């Protein structure tokens, strides 16, 4: 483990009894404590609306934590130490009077980190109340997605927060940026001359980015049906991955150098004109099918379903980046629920050699790919052509993967969860794994024109059976350009 | 050249038929080809040597040697019987033209049959054999001649051999063997370079810092002391195997994958090699000779105590040198070649060391630049070394390897075939892509001769190195003076 400087703070967790906090944030904090990455003076304030004895809520928290942390990683000594850091405070986040108690609970000597695991609609109110209570000075605020549902509402949220906090103390979370392999993208691209030399339209034919989920809606009706897959996944995770793949080298690893380069990519995204929506974008909605061999219901048949919903659970689209480096290289993005497997993967397809000298019937085989697997089984694979074994006539070729599997190479090392890394970076004051205001807004601006186009078309999402790779139209999307999705079927 | 085709009838004449090469390499390879039905249906194999053996005695000798070489599961009595039926032995003296008349009569009619004359003999016999074959009417348009190394001892002697052979056989019917070219991974080099768009843009001086080519053996000279003491590692290994590997790494893409196109490109590399002559040999080359040491826990003797070796021999058993290819693609990129006997490990390997990234984003530098490793033996593999993020917290980098172990990747059903099987099949089919052309051989000697002359003129004696080490310390200096080091 590399030496990491550990700084103290008070973490005020708004929405402490919500699903995100119990499933992700507290387990991550526990793990950080276990690895001695929480300063001994760091305190965690669990804040929620629920009244009642703090001990009761902390007991609930302990129960949930034991479920979330793998048994072999549970240590009662660590838990006791963690428990000593914890306090529970009941409060109504929109009631200014409630902040008097918070004010008293906060140690003036320690920087405050306010984590908003709440709907974005209350972000502004919380910020105003923190400021009114004298708690905004030096405080960092951490914002979970979604930040609005379009450019306008996103701006409202950002402006409400910006009234009280400068950008340098706002940390917008996209948990994908905390994943090990996403961070490896930066190392892969900028510490290896072998790839950077060829990272442009001269050598790359096209790029695929897939984020597939096996599960369906899982009870998130209130939020998801209003959002759809584009807002839920493309606007944030997929565009962030696209930025990391497509960005120019920053001059250093500071937050703003990296985020400046990402914003340049977002600004270069070509809007998809209304007349091209049908050929460049596919929306889907899953119907009844099979998952792990069991019958599963369609989206409109899920428990508590909105029967006439036209929310999309699948999006595939072709994105073009209008800049010197990428002009002419399509980026195919694909994301969906109820896919055959959970898979997040980036595939860089290199162009064919300029002149082919081997047996003509093998010409279609020839192409190199760099496959970056984000999950499951994080790893990197470089597909090269090698000679097939045998005494056959001429030079018979085959594809061979040069690969690195993190689980094999680093089998002894535990790869931290995304939230562990992100929480650590917040406590350290590092912003490069967080999303900047202009990034969010350019991403919304680009998505908004798509959504507006769909609304004008009034086209229903195409059905696809649960357990498939999405509507047949998504295959046609790529096939129209003479290509196919890597590894499907 | 016309497209190679498999003939239906073939006579293979092995001169030196009772020698080590024939018994340990050629007969096992031919047996395997027979076993897999890859030989033309009507193939006859004639072993020719001076030993006064009758056919039965030769067959017994052949069976004993083939059994010793091929895996038990590959040897079956029925198959051996079928193979033995193809085999014939004729005692003859290859230096006597009268014996060739007898040979011709023994072959009976060779009309319409491909004739393969495999010269597993001393190179001093190459010219007389070719001449005698011609006199006996065995060098017609369907006849091919296969020459094993060494092809001469210098440019002059190589030229003399080539001229003598050339008077009888035109170039398209001469097959000069470097068995390295028959190895799977050497052929993979061609596929790697020209079937992958990924590598070509970085395969040049702008992106490559240097190339290392090593062919190291743990064995000593064993029974070859008499030949070896006269040749040395430069003639035995560098002039052929290592220069061939250098050609495959450095050559331009051929217009087609055929014999003439490929060999034209290799020749261009040899012609672009910067000469090393005179005092340059002291800066650019290192000679070594192994002293007593330990390998695999066993004490082994020094070179000059080996059988048939002169006690005050100054023959080199190790060479390291810096070659330069003076052309547009490679100017300024050193190619470090290294070969030795009684080294710590048996390893044949090519390492392409790329240049570092132009600007490091990580404090404290970006670490080692990328490398491409091509391991020829043991355990054929290809590996790319990259920088990746160290797992866990923080943004530190560390080298990782993306690798393909060719032996593992290939189907377990497929048998690992031997270089000689590939090469013999190509001779029968008339495909000379994996064989050396006359001008290649002469260009290689043309580059090697001035180094040998420089060593003599400047009394550059081999440096001793203990058996089981990585060679003389001066070999490290060769790279260290330029801020580099041998990798493994």
Curated annotation (Swiss-Prot), chain A:
Substrate binds at residues 175, 179, 213, 232, 337, 342. Disruption phenotype: Mutant is unable to grow on minimal medium supplemented with mannitol and shows increased sensitivity to the redox-active superoxide-generating agent methyl viologen (paraquat). PANTHER family: GLUCOSE-6-PHOSPHATE 1-DEHYDROGENASE, GLUCOSE-6-PHOSPHATE 1-DEHYDROGENASE G6PD. Pathway: Carbohydrate degradation; pentose phosphate pathway; D-ribulose 5-phosphate from D-glucose 6-phosphate (oxidative stage): step 1/3. The active site is at residue 237. Catalyzes the oxidation of glucose 6-phosphate to 6-phosphogluconolactone. Can utilize either NADP(+) or NAD(+). InterPro entries: G6P_DH, G6P_DH_AS, G6P_DH_C, G6P_DH_NAD-bd, NAD(P)-bd_dom_sf. The keyword Oxidoreductase applies. This is Glucose-6-phosphate 1-dehydrogenase. Its EC number is 1.1.1.363. GO terms for cellular component: cytosol. The gene is zwf.
